[in-house]
């Protein structure tokens, strides 16, 4: 059996959870929604988002409306493609276990 190759930029549990949320509920979510839903600190979430942004999987957008400012996280086309490839690789890795 060939070695399993999963994208480490996505495979880390917090980043995987972020990507799952964006695919399932996105394509765009508020930073605070992700923070609260995933029970993360602001700094921890920001650190993982920077890694996903550097990979081109997400975009961060700051918006100000009246006195309220918010950061939105949007999955990119590249992020969708990388997530689909990740799921395909994971399915291939698990396929031998289904027999």
Give residue ranges: language-model regions.
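Amphipathic alpha-helical dimerization/coiled-coil segments
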Residues: 1-3, 81-99
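N-terminal helix-turn-helix DNA-binding core of bacterial DNA-binding proteins
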Residues: 5-44, 65-66, 70-74
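Basic, amphipathic "hinge/linker" alpha-helix immediately C-terminal to the N-terminal HTH DNA-binding motif
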Residues: 65-86, 90
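Short beta-strand "wing" residues that participate in macromolecule-binding interfaces
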Residues: 60
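Glycine-centered, phosphate/nucleic-acid-interacting loop/turn motifs that mediate DNA/RNA or nucleotide
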Residues: 56
